[in-house]
Curated annotation (Swiss-Prot):
Coiled-coil segments: none
InterPro entries in the cross-refs: Aldolase_TIM, NADPH_DH_bac, OxRdtase_FMN_N, YqjM-like
Keyword list, A-Z: Detoxification, Flavoprotein, FMN, NADP, Oxidoreductase
GO BP field: response to toxic substance
Residues the record lists as binding FMN: S23, P24, M25, C26, A60, Q102, R215, G307, R308
Tagged with keyword Protein biosynthesis: no
Pfam family, any one: Oxidored_FMN
UniProt xrefs under CDD domains: OYE_YqiM_FMN
Function: Catalyzes the reduction of the double bond of an array of alpha,beta-unsaturated aldehydes and ketones. It also reduces the nitro group of nitroester and nitroaromatic compounds. It could have a role in detoxification processes.
Family stated for the protein in its record: Belongs to the NADH:flavin oxidoreductase/NADH oxidase family. NamA subfamily.
UniProt protein name: NADPH dehydrogenase
Subunit composition and interactions: Homotetramer.
Length: 345
């Protein structure tokens, strides 16, 4: 029997062998605090590729040193960082998966000794420091940093770029009226709050012609914040700019209580897919093959982003295949393992 979860998916000239994506998750493991890839990253991402994930997405990678969440985040702000990232993509490709990178700036959530930058001088909560409102010059420099990061991503061998526009980091801070109190052309109306992201997408499109994703937080979980309907308009603009897929997460732009349950964010992927007519990825407490397959067969999303479940078990695709009774291709080195479900050599 054929399963959609294990069917190929093509975006532009990149074909994923299945619909399983390793969701980007910060590992805080650049031990020398220089943004460099370490041996841990090679093993961490290479193992998920060997486990038959279709697309392995590298964690949020800072486009500027001051855009890191912590000093131990990965970086892509300098050419010296390309070599380590290229080793990582080579590991991933050698094990049969495609490689993606999430480009990010932490904004007011940067927990560094230096000043945190944000659209407005509004702290995330009472315990975090008040950020510095970005000048227009700093905005332009950050847009350029995303463009240069895209160039380096191409040089490092990535197949897909994702822009991190979610979870209360810098781009999300510009999009939400809860964190953006500006009165210039970057604040106020939805069009103005979108301007920063628009400029980033345009700048990346000048140097990158591969698949482009954007991760969003489709619900601020606040009465004065954004809802998924607001993001329908944002994602329509993204589609007009050539974005290929929306990775639909939620929350974290302000402190909020969120009731989580299995697949609690799938509704956002479905809503954006239906109302913005753009491909989406579903993420959030998706833990079984049957659950993932149902999301795809119900046409609620196009890709399945798996996070913590892949931390618990890097061979989740094999477990999902066994659960569904599907014969998944496996590395020939593992064929002697008990419970193998393929005889490919």
């Amino acid at each position: 029997m054929n399963y959609k979860l294990f069917s190929p998916y093509t975006i532009k000239d990149v074909t994923l062998k299945n619909r399983i994506v390793m969701s980007p998750m910060c590992m805080y493991s650049s031990e020398n605090e220089d943004g460099q890839v370490t041996n841990f990253h090679l093993v961490h991402y290479g193992t998920r590729a060997a486990g038959q994930v279709g697309l392995v997405m590298i964690e949020a990678t800072a486009v500027l040193p001051g855009g890191r969440i912590s000093n131990k985040d990965l970086g892509i702000w300098d050419d010296s960082l390309i070599e380590g990232l290229h080793k990582t993509t080579t590991f991933i490709h050698d094990n049969g998966a495609k490689a993606a990178i999430q480009l990010a700036h932490a904004g007011r959530k940067a927990e560094l000794e230096t000043d945190a930058l944000a659209p407005s001088a509004v702290p995330f909560n009472e315990t975090m420091k008040t950020p510095v409102e970005m000048s227009k010059h700093q905005i332009k420099d950050t847009v350029l940093a995303f463009q240069q990061a895209a160039i380096r991503s191409k040089q490092a061998g990535f197949d897909v770029i994702e822009i991190h526009g979610a979870h209360g980091y810098l781009i999300n801070e510009f999009l939400s009226p809860l964190s953006n109190k500006r009165t210039d052309e970057y604040g106020g109306s939805p069009e103005n709050r979108y301007r920063f992201l628009r400029e980033i997408i345009d700048s990346i499109n000048e140097v990158w012609n591969g698949p482009l994703f954007v991760r969003i937080s489709a619900n601020d979980y606040h009465p004065d914040g954004l809802t998924v309907q607001d993001y329908v308009q944002y994602t329509k603009w993204m589609k007009e700019q050539g974005v290929d897929l929306i990775d639909c997460s939620s929350g974290a732009v302000v402190p909020a209580r969120i009731d989580v349950y299995p697949g609690y964010q799938v509704q956002y992927a479905k809503h954006i897919k239906e109302h913005a007519n753009i491909a989406t990825g579903a993420v959030g407490l998706i833990t079984t093959g049957a659950q993932a397959e149902q999301i795809l067969t119900n046409n609620e999303a196009d890709l399945i982003f798996i996070g913590r479940e892949l931390l618990r078990n890097p061979y989740f695709p094999r477990i999902a295949a066994n659960e569904l009774g599907f014969e998944l291709e496996e590395p020939y080195q593992y064929e002697r393992a008990p419970g193998k479900i393929s005889t490919n050599k």
